[in-house]
Structures are given as C-alpha cells and as structure tokens.
C-alpha cells in the first residue's frame, strides 16, 4: 500500500490523500462486516461449547499459528490486492476497493499469524469484542500505511518491498514465539 500511496502523495497530495481516505473507508466497512460475521458465529459456538473448551481451542490454535510463523509458514493465500486497477480507478475508489479487500482478512497475504490469532480469540473467547478488535486492526493498518507513505521520501521502499529488510524475519519469529507462549498459557489456565 505504501508503495502506491507514497509515490501518489509525491506526485499529487490530493490524489494520495483521496487514496488514503478511501483505504480507511474500505478497511472500516469490511472490518465492520467481518465483525458481524464473527459475532454471530462466535455466539453460536458459545451456545454449543463451554468456556473451558473454547479457551482450550483458542490456545491450541494460537500455538499452531505461532509454530507456523516460527517455521516461516504463515497461513495465507498467495494473492495481493488487484494491481490492474492502479491505472483504471480513481484514487479514492482504488483505496476503497483495496481497503475492503484487505480488511476481509482471508483474501490477501499475511506477514504474521497475529491476525489469525486475534480473529480466533474474538470468535471463541469474546465475540462481542469483535467489532472493537477488527475495526481497531483496520485503523492500525491504515495508520501504518499512512505513516509509511509519508516517510516514503525519507526512506524509499526497495523494489522488493519491506519484506526483504533484515528485521522482517525477526518480526515474524517474535510474533510466532509470542503466539506459542500465549497459546500455551491459555490452554494451561483454561481449566483452572
């Protein structure tokens, strides 16, 4: 996103700003839709499974996601937002479409499994918090893209993006270790 918004802001601040506002609107709209689905499904699961079982399942899922990150196998599909729209859609609509696509969570690549961990915890432990968590994640994502886009001029992204930076594998390992520890603690405390 910053690889598009940064140069767009450099060429035309109004166009770049429209892209970022569209990105915000799309992310929040899709996060709201996802949170509704998580809430309904999570409340249904709560009717079937007791709290200790839901906590245990959450913990096991967090451990699995953490191990996947540690093994550099974060679960996601190999797809990014549709690149062909860069030259055909106006900036605001492009941001809206891409933001909506990103906030659906299942449709694009992921850097770490933290997204899946939050989604699992919201679904199984506290479905009523799903709107706060998912919209909050969307706002943080847009804020991150905005800050990275504004700092584009100081530190341009390489042609391969930030993923080739030396800190990236460490970030994924730290996320994986955190998920494993949190998952193990969740399972350990589930039946206390």
Label the model's feature ranges.
Residues 48-109, 153-170:
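Alpha-helical multi-pass membrane helix bundles of inner-membrane/thylakoid proteins
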Residues 1-33:
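Juxtamembrane transmembrane-helix termini in multi-pass membrane transport proteins
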Residues 50-66, 125-142:
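Alpha-helical transmembrane segments
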Residues 41-50, 115-121, 191:
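Membrane-interface helix termini and inter-helical loops of multi-pass transporters
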Residues 1-4, 106-118:
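Transmembrane helix boundary and interhelical junction motifs in multipass membrane proteins
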Residues 181-192:
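Juxtamembrane boundary at the C-terminal end of a transmembrane helix
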């Amino acid at each position: 996103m910053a690889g598009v918004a940064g140069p767009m802001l450099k060429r035309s601040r109004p166009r770049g700003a429209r892209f970022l506002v569209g990105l915000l609107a799309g992310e929040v709209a899709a996060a709201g839709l996802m949170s509704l689905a998580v809430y309904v499904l999570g409340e249904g699961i709560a009717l079937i499974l007791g709290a200790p079982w839901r906590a245990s399942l959450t913990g096991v899922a967090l451990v699995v996601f953490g191990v996947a990150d540690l093994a550099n196998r974060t679960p996601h599909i190999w797809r990014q937002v549709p690149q062909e729209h860069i030259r055909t859609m106006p900036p605001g609509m492009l941001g809206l479409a891409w933001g909506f696509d990103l906030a659906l969570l299942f449709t694009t690549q992921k850097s770490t499994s933290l997204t899946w961990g939050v989604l699992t915890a919201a679904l199984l432990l506290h479905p009523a918090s799903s709107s706060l968590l998912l919209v909050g994640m969307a706002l943080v994502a847009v804020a991150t893209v905005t800050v990275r886009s504004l700092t584009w001029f100081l530190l341009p992204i390489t042609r391969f993006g930030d993923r080739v930076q030396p800190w990236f594998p460490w970030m994924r390992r730290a996320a994986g270790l955190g998920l494993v520890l949190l998952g193990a603690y969740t399972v350990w405390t589930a039946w206390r």
